[in-house]
Structures are given as structure tokens and as C-alpha cells.
Amino acid sequence: MKYKLSEIMDIIGGGTPKTSKPEYWNGDIPWLSVKDFNNDYRYVYETEKTITQAGFDNSSTKLLKRNDSIISARGTVGEMAMISYPMAFNQSCYGLRAKEGLVDEEYLYYLIKHNVVVLKKNTHGSVFDTITRDTFDDIEVELPSLVEQEIVASILQDLDDKIEVNNEINNNLAA
């Protein structure tokens, strides 16, 4: 069945606590920016910066859950990762949460990654390319059944896991 990308996921905006308020920073909440994406790995395992509960409460940032996807929406458009544990994130990204019962979380990651070129072609902005919420309305995808999604995602995960192991071996050999 065909769906607009915006129909199969919740699109979550991020935010940044005021940097002029030191009490908002260096807390217990991981705060994700594009710098933290590691293209060699599917998941983000750590963030450069953290925020406090006060920083979280006094900004527009949201908390992503394990297995949510995240995509860079400004500047370096289309970088992707999955969230390995709950973390907040900045406004240069969108969190993408699979609609339960409609799309598998892992499948959504691969579906969006597969469509990054199309997303980039549909960016807006005069100075910087930007993915907006409307960008996700403009793209239609065919969704197989949940069972088929899980099978496809499992195969792709296995391949990604092997690539990650090979990258680690290569990094150890180079060291």
C-alpha cells in the first residue's frame, strides 16, 4: 500500500538550550547534534554534549527513544542514524518515530536512508538546503506487510553488523 512518508512516522523537532546559561549544560541528558553521527555505524552511542533537566525543560528539545531514527535537516542534509538510548537533540535534525502497527522501526530507518537522495532533491531554502516537514509530505513509498518489513530489516541489519565489525577490524589494523 502507498503512503506519504509523513503518514508512517511522527516527525519530531529538536531544540537547543540557551548556551549563555551554564546551568543548562553538562548534565545527565545526552544532547545530540549532527557532529555525533558516526557514518561507520548505524547507532549513535555517545554525544559530545549533555544538558541538564533545567536545560531540557527550558528549551524546545525533545527526547528520542531507543530505535527512533534521526536525520539532519539543515546544512549537511540527509545524514542518518538510529538512537541507541534516550537522548535529546538540536533543531538541525528531525527525530523520526515509526507509527506502531504500520511500520517497523528498523525498516523505517532503511526506508528513509534509501530515500535520502529523493529527500535532498526536495529540500527548500535559499541559503542552506533544508528538509522541512512538508518534504516528507511530498514523497510516497510502498509499504509491505509488517512481517515482510521485519524480514527485510533483519537482513539489512545483519549486513550492517558485518560492515561495522569489518570497520572495527580495519581501524584496529590501522592503529
Predicted regions and their residues:
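Non-catalytic DNA-recognition/assembly elements of restriction-modification systems
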Residues: 1-15, 31, 138-175
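A generic "binding-loop/recognition-motif" signal
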Residues: 57, 76, 92, 115
